[in-house]
Every structure is written in structure tokens, then in C-alpha cells.
Amino acid sequence: MNAASAKTAAVLTISDSSYVGKREDVSGPAIVRELEAANFKVVHTSILPDEKDLIAARLIECSELTRLVVTTGGTGIAARDVTPEATLGVIERRVEGIEEKMRQEGAKKTPFAALSRGVCGVRGKTLLLNLPGSPSAAVESLQAVIGILPHALELLDGKTDH
């Protein structure tokens, strides 16, 4: 697998109920639409259960395939919300500013944004980004940072002229 294109992305929905077919995945397709509108080419989507090892393995696979891996779901404080832990286990560096920006924007709409534990980090030349599971919160969080993602990927490519 080769992360050749600067604007390729993968979208992973983390949800036990969507994984077993009890609930339709609405957040994943909404994120795909937002990314495509921002000229990202989404080359992989999948639905995974809230299982830390499975999430971590797919994050690694997708980071070798794409430049941006976006997850939705599993970022809250419930016992099975393990997406941040899986992400922290595979990234090399955190990008706290992106995390903070998403929570700040979310807090403008609801105080519950403070319960999101989503992280953002770097693995190789790939950016990994955790979004909330709620479709509206996922889209709003992505919209808060989507404008800076291309520049972040350029920086990961070593393009530091600015």
C-alpha cells in the first residue's frame, strides 16, 4: 500500500450497533461527503466494532494506504468508547491544536462537546483524526478543521515554505 496522493482519505465508523447491522451508519457517509467536497479522494471506508485492537490494526492499515484517516464514534466516556486509546497506541505525535479547535467549535453548540476525548495525531506522513459519533457533531468537528488539513499534510511532506 502506498500513501502516494496528498489528498487521499479513509473513513472508519466505530460503532457496535452499526457493525452488527442494528443501526444505519449515517456519520461515515456524512464525513465522506464533507471530505469529497474539500477535494479529498476517499479510497476506503469501513465499519468496525468498539474493539481497541481491531481499531488499531485498521488505523495502521489505512495509514499506509492514505494521507488522512478519519474515525467517527467511540470518543465519549462510555466503557466501550476506546477509539482514542486505539489511536494513541499507533500515532507517533499528537496534534493537540486540532483537538482543541474541534472541541472549542463544538462547545459553541452544546456543553456536551466537553465529553469528547477525540485525538489527532501523526503516523508517518498520515494524519489520524477522531470525530464524535453523532452525525451532526462529526460534521461540525470536521468543518472546524478541514481548512487546515491540506496544509498539515504539506508540512508532513516537508513543505515548510510559508
Task: Kindly label every feature range from the protein language model.
Residues 1-162:
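Non-catalytic beta/alpha edge segments that cap or flank active sites
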